[in-house]
């Protein structure tokens, strides 16, 4: 499949046991796996950068996209403990930067302060 999350989309050639182990862990924990779209991944990547100050690559943001999808689908209980591991620095794949409205300011600390305070 073609996706922006190339780091997690492969055929596991040469390490097929990783997929088997992953499925076993999901089954033992009574968990689940789900698919997320490139748009959901980009939305998670942008959210993480803008709201949390974390710039992760698309593969790293896929877990947050899955969390959002699971929550909106009612799959996460109010008393659930959820952990999402974020990996892969955003500089590995910077395509999402085109989605940001990045302000350009003069070389003046007062302009920077204004941007930060807004």
Model-derived regions, located:
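Glycine-rich beta-alpha junction loops
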Residues: 8, 12, 39-40, 60-62, ...
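Phosphate-binding loop/pocket of nucleotide- and phosphate-handling active sites
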Residues: 1-2, 62-118
